[in-house]
Amino acid sequence: GKALLYFEVVTTVALLIGLAVSTFIEPGIGVIRDDIAGGDISKYTQKAAGFSWISFLKENFTVQVLGFSIFFGIFLNYVKGKAKMIAGMQQASQWVFKGLKIVMYLAPLGALGGMAFTIGKFGIHSLIPLAKLMLTVYVTMAIFVFVVLGFIMRSCGERIWAFLGYIKHELLVVLGTSSSEAALPSLMHKLEKMGCSKSVVGLVVPAGYSFNLDGTSIYLSMATLFLAQVYGIDLSVEQLLTIIGVLMVTSKGAAGVTGSGFVVLASTLTALQVIPLEGLALLLGVDRFMSEARAITNFIGNGVATIWLAKHEGEFHQPEA
């Protein structure tokens, strides 16, 4: 219970930081909307003006599926022989993400084509807003790591810089693969060697890859506001709160594999029905570069979460000699 509470609080802080920075810097301002998509967005602005929670829950298939999944998971707790069902679902999930991984290997070719088309049609100046978004995302995640996660580490009597040095080889693996899942076994071994109990590591790290994706949370909130700014959609306070609420749920559906954040972003926009999905084409060209920042932040965040819980549960022992 304490682990889930930690996950929810920290990822919510990540979402709020992403929204705050995007609102202040406005990376989407300056992007020419007609250069992205020529479709009619009036239906989206009409939905924004006539928003209601009843229609939101009734019309959004994504939210319905997520809600069903949550209640189905609760129901499974009371079913005998649930282990086989859970194992089957985990196996199916692995197949899906293996397929996604294969697709993402080809994504750079599509991204290259998209970038070449953008530059050829609109000029090199069209990349400036994308560079602004990338820089904003990287700076925001750095602030989150060294300020928020740094504060959490200090509260545990540890230092964030020392921890980053301790896992530097794993960080290079994550950077090279753009997947925080690639270094999962090594992270668990290092945390146990550092002094965290095996039971805490075995619980927090795997759970964190579904519930504690700090980097993905920052990216989702910033990308959502970026696209809203691109299309000139002035979001109300109620809609911003709705975005936070939806992201608090959909961000838990991402995985530590390359490209999953982009898939979750598409699901989020589908659920919101306020921002045109065509805008995702603009992000495709730079998503691979931002995926590295997401993966590294997710990776560090799960390590810090494990240390925090081990310290607070009295499950942190002297490091091995």
Regions found by a protein language model. Give the residues of each.
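Membrane-interface alpha-helices at helix entry/exit sites of multi-pass transporters
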Residues: 1-6, 101-105, 193-209, 237-238, ...
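Alpha-helical transmembrane segments of multi-pass membrane proteins, especially transporters
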Residues: 2-11, 65, 86-89, 133-137, ...
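Signature of multi-pass transmembrane helix bundles
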Residues: 2-161
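Transmembrane alpha-helices that form the ion-translocation and gating core
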Residues: 9-38, 136-169, 173-174, 180-183, ...
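Transmembrane alpha-helix boundary and packing residues in multipass membrane permease domains
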Residues: 19, 70, 74, 110-117, ...
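Juxtamembrane helix-boundary/capping and inter-helix hinge elements in multi-pass membrane proteins
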Residues: 79-83, 122, 157-161, 191-201, ...
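Alpha-helical membrane segments and immediately flanking helix-loop junctions
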Residues: 166-220, 248-265, 289-308
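Transmembrane alpha-helical segments and their short flanking loops
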Residues: 221-321
